[in-house]
Amino acid sequence: MVRLVLLIVATFVGNAVAADELPRRKSGLWSMSVTMPGASVPLTMQQCVDERTDDITGTMADRNKACRNQTKRTDDRLAFDAICKVGKTTSTTRGVFVGDFKSGYTVESTTTFDPPMAGMRNGVTKAAAQWSGPCKSDMKPGDVVMSNGTKFNINDHKSAKKK
């Protein structure tokens, strides 16, 4: 389930912006909240990042190379548009990242799928992230802890275990 949620987030946002186009986040513990179509409550998680594991757009998803991307950076904003082929579906995403990536950022994106993907025709994804301080002593860079206690490392996405 965790991987499915992260795959959906990455599909909405991850293919739209290449990781090298985003500013790097400050190393440490980031608290995130994501609202997705069909979810009754936001998905919350904490992630320990450093310069090697910082991938806002989702290491968990295989990047689809069949995307046409456009980005425009102004001050603390990064607007993006992308048209991607995901299997037989074309996804069209438009959104914006806002923030300094040192203390926090938000992202909002609107995606349409043609034909619908997993029964979904379109949706708006919103996320907010705040730097919380140094990583906890029991976390290493790449560790993600979901609100239900599931813990995994983005570098070892084959294992998801209960904390």
Q: For the regions a protein language model found, what residue spans apply to each?
A:
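Edge beta-strand at a domain terminus
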Residues: 119-161
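Hydrophobic h-region of N-terminal signal peptides that target proteins for export
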Residues: 6-18
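Mid-chain, structured segments of secreted extracytoplasmic proteins
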Residues: 58-102
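Positively charged n-region of N-terminal signal peptides that target proteins for export
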Residues: 1-4
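N-terminal helix-cap/turn-to-beta initiation motif at the start of protein domains
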Residues: 17-28, 73
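Hydrophobic/aromatic beta-strand elements that line small-molecule binding cavities or substrate pockets
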Residues: 45-47, 67-70, 91-99, 109-113, ...
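Short, solvent-exposed loop/hinge segments that bridge or flank secondary-structure elements
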Residues: 32-66, 149-157
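Short beta-strand segments that buttress and anchor functional surface loops
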Residues: 32-35, 79-86, 107-115
